[in-house]
Amino acid sequence: MSDSNLDGVLVLIPARMASTRLPGKPLADICGLPMIVQVAMRAREAAIGRVVVAVDETRVFDAVAAAGFEVVMTRVDHQSGSDRIFEALTKVDPEGKAKIIVNIQGDLPTIDPETVRAALRPLENEAVDIGTLTTEIDNEEDKTAPHIVKIIGSPISGNRLHALYFTRATAPYGQGPLYHHIGLYAYRRAALERFVSLGPSTLEKRESLEQLRALEAGMRIDAEVVDTVPLGVDTPADLEKARRILSAKSN
């Protein structure tokens, strides 16, 4: 995406304190900074546009603000990160200047800024409503693991897929690569507005995959192929790994 279009990009990072596996994880210390601040730093390093953190608790609000990042308070009862970022969008950009909304999960403190930028590339095609990311699965266990979401897509080029379905099953059948979906999204504003206006869809509820709502509504999702899956911090072991990675980079 050209630099001339970056003025219309808004990066929103949802942060939720009530994690079941790692409670309070937005404030977990990683190399002297709260994890949510580390994520905001990676987003700023991507240099694609304005960065705002959407929080649901005053302690997180204060920590993000103290680090010098823009932050907005949102309701605690949102059912999904998409709902939270939409509330944040209406608060921080009510005049509609942002035309593309990038949703970076608040538990990706080690994400490569280039990976963030890659999510924008599918939107170079005006027919695409939502851009996302994927990588080829090279671990045999991951191919059958339900927590690894697979993307079934038609190859558009060597580094992009047109998404036809997302599933926790091992698919598609037969010979050929399987792809791991990475849950980082770049929405056209109109697509996000439509997405949150729709109720949960049949397949979304069956697979517990929010992105299926968009596909069932006829929206187009394309996925850029990247080299690796960013580390999502969901457990104490993940947190220790993130600390090691960022500590090594700072030395």
UniProtKB/Swiss-Prot annotation:
Cellular localization per UniProt: Cytoplasm
InterPro entries: Cytidylyl_trans (IPR003329), KdsB (IPR004528), Nucleotide-diphossugar_trans (IPR029044)
Alphabetized GO MF terms: 3-deoxy-manno-octulosonate cytidylyltransferase activity
Enzyme Commission (EC) number: 2.7.7.38
A cellular-component GO term for this protein: cytosol
Catalytic reaction equation(s): 3-deoxy-alpha-D-manno-oct-2-ulosonate + CTP = CMP-3-deoxy-beta-D-manno-octulosonate + diphosphate
Pfam families, per the entry: CTP_transf_3
Keywords: Cytoplasm, Lipopolysaccharide biosynthesis, Nucleotidyltransferase, Transferase
S-S pairs: none
Any GO BP: CMP-keto-3-deoxy-D-manno-octulosonic acid biosynthetic process
PANTHER family tied to this protein: 3-DEOXY-MANNO-OCTULOSONATE CYTIDYLYLTRANSFERASE, 3-DEOXY-MANNO-OCTULOSONATE CYTIDYLYLTRANSFERASE, MITOCHONDRIAL
Purpose of the protein: Activates KDO (a required 8-carbon sugar) for incorporation into bacterial lipopolysaccharide in Gram-negative bacteria.
Name by which UniProt lists this protein: 3-deoxy-manno-octulosonate cytidylyltransferase
Taxonomic source organism: Rhizobium johnstonii (strain DSM 114642 / LMG 32736 / 3841)
